[in-house]
């Protein structure tokens, strides 16, 4: 039973939020040399709870809308399969999603009391967007934007909890990992194109079509690396953050694999896996760059 719930939560994708929180903490360490461990741990727990919530609610609504019965499930796309396969009850998944949302909201509420309106605004955005992600946001063609903004706000919120201020460094750094996370969502939407389109979803792949969407793929790493290189050149961030460029060979491999398999649900799996690997490696190295003294 536990394995079914871990599958429903998409445990492997939680690393995106772990990296985002870690980045906020690493920028804090680089800036001040101190971290409040209790608040850091609580932040991590709250963010993971909110991330689990959006994945569970997304699984529930995709099943209710009939999307997951139309998609071909892969290790990276097509839903978790726990509901179509009858491994968990839809109501249980929905209730679990709400419970995680409440848990994350309570932790966030604690930080609102401590740190005020900035955290309140971030928390309000998080709760509203998580609840309406699968029923509204994806239908409006804003899923990739939501993920990028979510990642950025996690970094900003983590930093603000530690420092009670926001800086250009933390905002720009947040955009870097937010865009990297959005790239993963973007590439995993290729195999789901037909089912998503039939059920009213509007991903970037649907809006532009599979072939044109391949060209959009380049934009994500260009934005992230453009910020890193530009900020390092202007001494806004440590030059050591350039170690994230070591992940470039992985993204080149991803692009090649995507081009050769854009319409093949089976052959595109390696492209999705290498894109996920790139996102995590680049993000982790970026975090490490702030810690190197």
Label for each model-derived stretch:
Residues 1-38, 42, 46, 138-144:
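Topogenic membrane-insertion module of multi-pass membrane proteins
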Residues 18-24, 146-160, 177, 206-210, ...:
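Small-residue-rich segments of transmembrane alpha-helices in multi-pass membrane proteins
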Residues 25-45, 105-120, 155-175, 227-240, ...:
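Helix-coil boundary and interhelical linker segments in multi-pass alpha-helical membrane proteins
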Residues 32-57, 120-121, 125-131, 169-187:
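Membrane-embedded alpha-helical segments that form the functional core of polytopic membrane enzymes
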Residues 72-112, 205-236, 276-282:
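Multi-pass membrane catalytic core of lipid/isoprenoid biosynthesis enzymes
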Residues 79-168:
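Intramembrane alpha-helical segments
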Residues 236-293:
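Extended hydrophobic alpha-helices typical of membrane-associated regions
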């Amino acid at each position: 039973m536990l394995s079914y719930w871990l599958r429903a939560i998409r445990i492997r994708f939680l690393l995106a939020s772990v990296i985002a929180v870690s980045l906020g903490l690493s920028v804090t360490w680089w800036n001040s040399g101190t971290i409040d461990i209790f608040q850091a741990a609580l932040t991590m727990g709250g963010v993971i709870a909110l991330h689990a919530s959006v994945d569970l609610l997304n699984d529930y609504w995709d099943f209710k809308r009939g999307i997951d019965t139309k998609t071909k499930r892969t290790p990276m796309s097509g839903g978790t399969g726990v509901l179509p396969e009858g491994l968990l009850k839809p109501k249980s998944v929905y209730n679990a999603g709400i419970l995680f949302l409440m848990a994350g909201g309570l932790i966030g509420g604690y930080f609102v009391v401590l740190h005020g309106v900035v955290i309140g605004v971030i928390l309000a955005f998080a709760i509203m967007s998580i609840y309406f992600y699968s029923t509204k946001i994806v239908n409006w063609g804003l899923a990739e934007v939501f993920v990028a903004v979510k990642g950025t706000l996690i970094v900003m919120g983590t930093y603000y909890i530690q420092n009670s201020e926001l800086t250009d460094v933390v905002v720009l750094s947040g955009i870097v990992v937010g865009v990297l996370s959005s790239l993963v969502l973007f590439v995993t939407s290729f195999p789901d194109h037909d089912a998503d389109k039939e059920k009213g979803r509007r991903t970037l792949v649907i809006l532009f079509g599979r072939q044109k969407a391949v060209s959009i793929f380049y934009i994500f790493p260009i934005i992230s690396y453009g910020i890193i290189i530009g900020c390092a050149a202007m001494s806004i961030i440590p030059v050591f953050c350039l170690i994230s460029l070591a992940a470039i060979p992985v993204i080149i491999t991803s692009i090649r694999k995507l081009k050769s398999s854009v319409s093949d649900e089976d052959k595109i799996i390696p492209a999705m896996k290498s894109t996920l690997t790139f996102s995590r490696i680049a993000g982790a190295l970026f975090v490490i760059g702030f810690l190197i003294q």
